Amino acid sequence: MIAVLVLASNAIAAEMRVMRGSTGETIRARLEGIDGDTITLRREDWKTFEIPLTRFAPDEQARIRADAEALTAAAAEINEATGHELVNLTPLDGREAAEIAEALAIPQESATSHGSSWRRYAARGGGNAFRLFGAMPYSTALYSDADGLVAHLSIVYANKGDFGSTAGSGEAHFGGGTSATRSTLAEAMNADAKTITEALTEAIGEPTTQRFGERQARRTVTRWDWHGHSFILSHEDGEYVGLAIMSTEAADGGGRTDRISNTEIRERLAAGVRRAENGDVWITDIPMVDQGPKGYCVPATFERVMRALGVEADMYLLAMIGETQAGGGTSVRRLIDNVSSHVRSKGRRPHEETIRQLRIRSVKRRIDEGIPVMWVMHSMPEYNKIANENTTARAQDTDTEARLKAMREQIDKLASGPEPVGNNHICMIVGYNEKTGELAVSDSWGARYELRWVPIEAAQWVSRDELFYILP
């Protein structure tokens, strides 16, 4: 294959090399693009710039053109294996994430001041024909940095949460289970891993192995490198098959991420608090993660909170750490215990609190600081009906008192009946209004559920009176 020959040849340097100018001066750089007689280079200080090809010696010009031609052919091989126009001469971390999202038809999931994300669930809406590297990804998630450049692409194939799941999405996921068995999951995972390995090996060449990730998420992975891109394949028995695509520099770091200072995080959190004249106080700038058609509310919600606090996280890895059951269902206590050391290593402090009764004062201090509060509750259909109706009504509020009276009449009927059972769930409390006696809640079910307002009495009816949060 062309790509294999390219990588085997010293004529093509995937990383930095010395280039000779027309007057004898040299520069160490990496070729990242060519447009006619203009090339794009990345220097060792990681800055990119454009320069006329004529600034180089004639033999160097010929070498650069040959490099560009061979790299373009290699990129075509990888894109054929991908099934989409994914790579070019510019490594992913130098490209706009929105461009990659468009190429892969991934809808935007979240946008914050410190990064954005896009996510596609291929199995939704009859999208089973979607393939990446020959296999169907259940989840394709793209993450950007604050400047909109690609941070990494995370593709999850057969896994214990999505494979065989009979659950719906959002409010409809409760009561769902899985048709998968240990045997059928293992068979699907092995098939996906084999297909992906063969596709990447044919396009790029033989892989290497390395240890990757931090603490409980540390694992042995298979790695392919091409021109500043690293393709990292994880195959964790009984858990998931995943492919992460990132820069070779990030891969060389073994998946470790930098620690952001507590001062910076506190400033970021405080800047995200909004206050309205009607008394609403709520937190913005929290990433959204859609848990999809499975019971991953705990790992999805923890991912959102951890990322808001500057700690990189992925719900599929958190599901493994938290020993989530097939199809979903995670012990909050187990996940807290298992993820605490990682959170502390980044300078953050996990905290839990058991309360006698949920009140606005239970969360007010944290909300004022910009810290989302994770709340364990029963997400009953009656509660969701009230949350949806109240949120819609208050958006066009002309008579707040009448609206709340109508809501509380529904709540009084519920409170006089049996206590809620089942539909165990965790979401976030992200706001309050002391004047109206309402809480703002955020579920990990996509944009529609990012901010809903519920009367405190409705929240009290479904509350299990356990709160969790992470402090800077």
Give the positions of each predicted feature:
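Predominantly the structural core of cysteine protease catalytic domains
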Residues: 329-426, 430-434
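Amphipathic N-proximal alpha-helical interface segments
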Residues: 74-88, 102-192, 209-268
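Active-site-adjacent structural segments surrounding the nucleophilic cysteine of cysteine proteases
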Residues: 77-93, 99-100, 107-109, 213, ...
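Short coil-to-beta-strand transition motifs
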Residues: 20-28, 194, 417-428
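Compositionally biased alpha-helical segments
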Residues: 12-87
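Bacterial N-terminal signal peptides
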Residues: 1-8
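Second-shell loop/turn segments in exported
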Residues: 50, 181-190, 283-294, 304-305, ...
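Noncatalytic regulatory segments and standalone regulatory/sensor domains
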Residues: 242-258, 262-281, 400-426, 430-472
